Amino acid sequence: MVLVNRPSAKLQTYTLRPDDPQVVSFGARIYAQQCAACHGVRGEGQSDWRERGTDGLLPAPPHDPSGHTWHHPDSQLFAITKFGLAKLIEQPDYKTAMPIYDRVLSDHEIVAVLSWIKAQWPPDVRTRHDEINEAARKSGM
């Protein structure tokens, strides 16, 4: 489930569907077009992704279990993708190469991409991510 709170907008709820073959297939196509160039074809990310480059930017992290994507609830993943990390953490000068996908991808497309990413994780990681989502939901996140 994805919860996004935008200024002057109602709280929006989306449900990731990593078990829906149509959604996952759609997400795979969008991922290949919009994400794979930086995050890798299989979500492996860029090397040295924890260290800022000479340009001051962090390389794209992996979306596979070796990265931290699954450490974040769906609501944060959706917000980072749509609005950018700087807005999420309220630090407008935060340097990142991650594009903002608001007005580039629809909410449905963002959910499909996130569903595809989650569908790639092994069952134990998906279970842990579901637990993170449940804790976030209970805390009102």
Positions of the model-derived regions?
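Extended surface/linker regions that mediate inter-domain or inter-protein docking
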Residues: 1-3, 116
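Electrostatic cytochrome c docking/interface patches
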Residues: 3-31, 129, 136
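Periplasmic/extracellular electron-transfer cofactor-ligation site
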Residues: 22, 28-59, 83-94, 119-127
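Stable alpha-helical elements in mature extracytoplasmic
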Residues: 23, 31, 73, 77, ...
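Gly/Gly-Pro-rich "capping" loops immediately C-terminal to redox-active cysteine motifs
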Residues: 28, 44-78, 97-105
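Mature, folded catalytic cores of secreted/periplasmic enzymes
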Residues: 53, 80, 131-134
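Flexible coil segments in periplasmic/lumen-exposed cytochrome c-class electron-transfer proteins
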Residues: 88-141
